[in-house]
């Protein structure tokens, strides 16, 4: 952690895969132990900051799904060097959120020392759960912030854009969708605050964190979409 806090190390978090999404137990990326190392092969997607990372926090399956009693078992977590000779990084072009790069990662015989495994083998899913709920709250807060920024730009444009001798913002067809966006963003923000409060108090917050992420994502997306349409007026 000290090198991360000092800015000497930059890390990316690699969990999501093309065909699994939130169904983390179905990850296909394999880490096969060979002596004092694991050999990793597979693919990840929507991985942030991989363009600049020199470290990677990686979740991979070390025991095949058909060999475990529960699907949450057999996943292991690693924190290791980002070897670009074994990891191909392909950036995903996005319409927004350009400040953070999003990427596809392709692992071909990527070697990870056993010492770079976090905790016990097969307990990775259990470990990441401790960080997933606060991450969901943070993502939800980000979505609300993006939506509010889009809304502020849309309303400013609606006040300045003059058509037929008056600002387009004086038309109810422009006003009502933006007002609806504002209400949805405010409601999502209250859900974010509720989830964050539950987490800070040490209470179970899984449902609230997921609800906040969903509501904020929907509200943020709709606000951005409406902002684009407003600028077309």
Locate each region found by the language model:
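Active-site-adjacent elements of ketosynthase-type condensing enzymes
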Residues: 18-28
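Flexible, small-/acidic-enriched active-site or ligand-binding loops
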Residues: 26, 83-113
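A short, Trp-centered hydrophobic/proline-enriched beta-strand micro-motif
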Residues: 7-15, 59
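Glycine-rich phosphate/pyrophosphate-binding beta-alpha loops
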Residues: 45-51, 97, 134-138
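Short glycine/proline-enriched turns and hinge-like loops at secondary-structure junctions
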Residues: 23-25, 49-54, 69-73, 98-100, ...
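Short beta-strand-to-turn element immediately C-terminal to the catalytic PLP-Schiff-base lysine
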Residues: 32, 58-62, 79-81, 106-108, ...
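A short core secondary-structure module
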Residues: 37, 41-90
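Alpha-helical interface subdomain recognition
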Residues: 3, 7, 33-38, 104-106, ...
């Amino acid at each position: 952690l000290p090198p991360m806090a000092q800015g000497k190390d930059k890390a990316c978090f690699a969990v999501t895969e093309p065909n699994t999404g939130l169904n983390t137990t179905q990850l296909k990326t394999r880490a096969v132990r060979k002596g004092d190392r694991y050999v990793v092969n597979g693919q990840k997607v929507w991985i942030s900051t991989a363009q600049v990372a020199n470290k990677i926090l990686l979740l991979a399956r070390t025991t095949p799904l058909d060999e475990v009693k529960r699907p949450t078992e057999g996943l292991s977590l690693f924190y290791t060097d980002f070897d670009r000779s074994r990891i191909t990084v392909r950036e995903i072009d996005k319409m927004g959120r350009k400040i953070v790069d999003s990427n596809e990662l392709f692992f071909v015989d990527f070697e990870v020392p056993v010492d770079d495994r976090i905790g016990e083998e097969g307990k990775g899913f259990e470990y990441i759960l401790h960080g997933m709920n606060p991450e969901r709250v943070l993502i939800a807060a980000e979505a609300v912030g993006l939506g509010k920024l889009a809304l502020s730009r849309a309303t400013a444009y609606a006040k300045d854009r003059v058509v037929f001798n008056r600002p387009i913002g004086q038309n109810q067809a422009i006003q009502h969708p933006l007002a609806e966006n504002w209400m949805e963003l405010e409601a999502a923000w209250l859900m974010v605050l509720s989830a964050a409060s539950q987490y800070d108090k040490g209470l179970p917050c899984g449902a609230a964190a997921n609800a906040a992420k969903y509501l904020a994502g929907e509200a943020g997306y709709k606000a951005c979409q409406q902002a684009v349409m407003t600028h077309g007026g």
